Amino acid sequence: MEKWWFNLILSNEELEHRCRLSKSMARPRPIGNTNGSQDPSINDRDKNGSDSGNYSFSNLDHLFDVKDNLSFIYDDTFLVRDSNGDSYSIYFDIENLIFEIDNDSFFLSKLESSFSNYLNSGSKNYNRYYDSYMYDTKYSWNNHINSYIDSYLCSEIRIDSYISSGIYNYSENYIYSYVWNGENVSTIKSRSSSIRTSANSSDINLKGRYNDFDINIKYRHLWVQCDNCYGLNYKKIFSSKMNICEQCGYHLKMSSSERIELSIDSGTWDPMNEDMVSTDPIEFHSEEEPYRDRIDSYQIKTGLTEAVQTGIGQLNGMPIAIGVMDFQFMGGSMGSVVGEKITRLIEYATNRSLPVIIVCASGGARMQEGSLSLMQMAKISSALYNYQLNKKLFYVSILTSPTTGGVTASFGMLGDIIIAEPNAYIAFAGKRVIEQTLNKTVPEGSQAAEYSFHKGLFDSIVPRNLLKGALSELLQLHGFFPLNHNSQVKR
């Protein structure tokens, strides 16, 4: 059971609230705004003090605004101090619906009475934040207390996504992604341990909290939410961080253009076959959206003509041929155009004796093109056979999340060196397909890169920020060296 300090301030007109948390329960120190209320009259009243019997509780319900917040702590004691400096211990046990106060006073009796009334009547008093579905059930009472506590936190704490890169071990903090005004990062790091909740006493769902706040919808122009820890990353600098979550290190998806910028030296990228587009070869029938219209919509959305970009460039001065698949374009599905562009890239590299790097990110063959999409597996594999076995050239396959289906069954696993990104989802058939087909449960994490690596499926797991250096060393190991400054790759 954890103990928390709260500082309550009451005024004659309304209930103001402030929050104080501290490592030392005997001597609490503020972590938020320590300058007092912005209202001078409230500051004066707080300094002078007044008889608790004169307090007006006409706006007491403001403290108990009901919102759909995440589950708070199930078994905690809060040390509460009113404006007179009197301290009280408030015990919450949400699971067993227990609310106890250790010191009887006018204020605390009103507070306890409010909670009792809530339990008995469902808190049917008017509340401008009230939702109709919160009237009864244990879930309602849970959220009632959550909002009570959140009202303190939100008054002093500013939502932000980044505390410190060194706080990864505190993923279960209730205030995991908050930054306190007026405190530097080192201070926050040192105090973060004091507000870490016990694993035995809390089960905090970070995803639920962010969904409650509608952060993705309201602030998606500012933040990128991590798929793993559900923390927020500042969008303006996210690309410079290589789309790696600053809070947990998870590798989020990248567009093909971002990967090209990451891997290829500036000013050396020369794309190939950009004008090649699909023409709906089998006239695929769709009740929702015609295939041709769907292609057009993805072209507008992504700025690409197809789900792969191919071309030549330099990697630390070494000329390479590279193809980068883009999952944002119809899930990176492999149709006839994708297969043709990759095949032409390999044939070009064969004629010029260039190393080939293909970055895979695909859901598999494109169903809208039927057997033509399946034939791309054989076509690309045939081109690689000539490239690798006959010409003895070097091919590196990079598997990113997700790499599944026909890509996994063909060129994705044919590299001389196969590299995967951390936590990448790599499989032939997806979890749901396997479970429905075999009627067996697929163990969690069995299709992650780390699991497959230990089974020998590929050669190495390389973090994104180290990838370019690793590729450079591999190329030099296989006899490829940087060009002279005056040399250029000619097509």
UniProtKB/Swiss-Prot annotation:
GO CC terms in record: acetyl-CoA carboxylase complex; chloroplast stroma
Cofactor details (free text): Binds 1 zinc ion per subunit.
An example Gene Ontology molecular-function term: acetyl-CoA carboxylase activity
Pfam families listed in its UniProt record: Carboxyl_trans
CoA carboxyltransferase N-terminal domain segment(s): 222-491
Catalytic activity: N(6)-carboxybiotinyl-L-lysyl-[protein] + acetyl-CoA = N(6)-biotinyl-L-lysyl-[protein] + malonyl-CoA
Chain positions covered by the region annotation Disordered: 26-49
Polar residues compositional bias, start-end: 32-41
InterPro entries named among the record's database cross-references: AcCoA_carboxyl_beta, Acetyl_CoA_COase_Trfase_b_su, ClpP/crotonase-like_dom_sf, COA_CT_N
Subcellular location: Plastid, Chloroplast stroma
Gene3D superfamilies cross-referenced by the UniProt entry: 2-enoyl-CoA Hydratase, Chain A, domain 1
EC number: 2.1.3.15
ZnF endpoints (C4-type): 226-248
GO biological process: fatty acid biosynthetic process; malonyl-CoA biosynthetic process
Names of the cofactor(s): Zn(2+)
Keywords from the named record: ATP-binding, Chloroplast, Fatty acid biosynthesis, Fatty acid metabolism, Lipid biosynthesis, Lipid metabolism, Metal-binding, Nucleotide-binding, Plastid, Transferase, Zinc, Zinc-finger
Coiled-coil residue windows: none
Binding locations of Zn(2+): 226, 229, 245, 248
Annotated NCBIfam families: accD
Subunit organization: Acetyl-CoA carboxylase is a heterohexamer composed of biotin carboxyl carrier protein, biotin carboxylase and 2 subunits each of ACCase subunit alpha and ACCase plastid-coded subunit beta (accD).
Family: Belongs to the AccD/PCCB family.
Protein purpose: Component of the acetyl coenzyme A carboxylase (ACC) complex. Biotin carboxylase (BC) catalyzes the carboxylation of biotin on its carrier protein (BCCP) and then the CO(2) group is transferred by the transcarboxylase to acetyl-CoA to form malonyl-CoA.
Protein name as annotated: Acetyl-coenzyme A carboxylase carboxyl transferase subunit beta, chloroplastic
Organism: Ceratophyllum demersum (Rigid hornwort)
Native organism taxonomy: Eukaryota, Viridiplantae, Streptophyta, Embryophyta, Tracheophyta
